[in-house]
Regions:
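N-terminal Rossmann-like NAD(P)+-binding subdomain of aldehyde/semialdehyde dehydrogenases
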Residues: 1-59
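Generic secondary-structure signature for well-ordered alpha-helical cores
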Residues: 10, 34, 38, 116-121, ...
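A general structural signal for well-ordered alpha-helical segments in protein cores
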Residues: 2, 25-26, 32, 108, ...
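Conserved NAD(P)+-binding/catalytic subdomain of aldehyde/semialdehyde dehydrogenases
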Residues: 68, 118-190
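Conserved small-residue-rich beta-alpha loop and adjacent elements
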Residues: 48-118, 165, 187
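Hydrophobic packing residues within well-ordered alpha-helices of enzyme cores
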Residues: 5, 108-111, 137, 157
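Residue-level signature of the cytosolic catalytic core of signaling kinases
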Residues: 18-21, 62, 129, 182
Length: 190
């Protein structure tokens, strides 16, 4: 994974990728694994009006999968922002379709191969491609759609999903500050 990320970024420290993408992904998946029984346990609620409780009524919430979740992940932390949400998605019993960033083609292809080797396409499907694929992906009738990325793109995602009344979770950013030293290639940096 760090090698693919480094190639996509023209060089990113292996240590940085291991800490930010790999270790953080493992932590998210472990949290889901360790808490799934508690998360899925039925939740008791108070009966209202309380007179119904006196008559023997009981109330509880039973959690059920939503169905198919769409996940659009960004270029800057391509692994953790793909694998991070997966723990919760799977813990809730859902399937997932993933659209990774076209700006990290090697990492996206590696993740696609990893999922294809370990899951059926009915459980996890990875769709790669550019902006047109992303626009088509956003307009699919998911049961929920997660997007992490720039605010300007998030507006398009929200608009496309609204045609199918798909609930959307947006994690919007848009700034990735860097330090450019006087020994840097200014043309390449800009």
């Amino acid at each position: 994974i760090p090698v693919a990320i480094s190639k996509d970024f023209s060089h990113r420290s292996e240590t940085s990728s291991l800490l930010t993408d790999v270790a953080s992904s493992i932590t998210s998946l472990k949290i889901a694994k360790n808490n799934i029984k508690q998360w899925m346990r039925p939740s008791k609620r108070k009966v209202s009006p309380s007179i119904l409780g006196l008559l023997g009524a009981k109330l509880r919430v039973e959690y059920q999968p939503l169905g198919t979740i769409g996940l659009i992940s960004p270029w800057n932390f391509p692994v953790v922002l793909t694998f991070g949400p997966l723990g919760s998605i799977f813990a809730a019993g859902n399937r997932v379709m993933i659209k990774p960033s076209e700006f990290t083609p090697r990492t996206s292809e590696l993740m696609k191969n990893m999922f294809e080797d370990n899951f059926s396409e009915e459980e996890v499907a990875v769709i790669t491609g550019g902006p047109e694929v992303g626009a088509d992906f956003s307009s699919l009738p998911f049961d929920h759609l997660l997007f992490t990325g720039a605010t300007s793109i998030g507006k398009h995602v929200m608009r496309a999903a609204s045609d199918n009344l798909v609930p959307v979770t947006l994690e919007l950013g848009g700034k990735s500050p860097v330090i450019v030293s006087d020994t840097s290639n200014i043309e390449q940096s800009s």
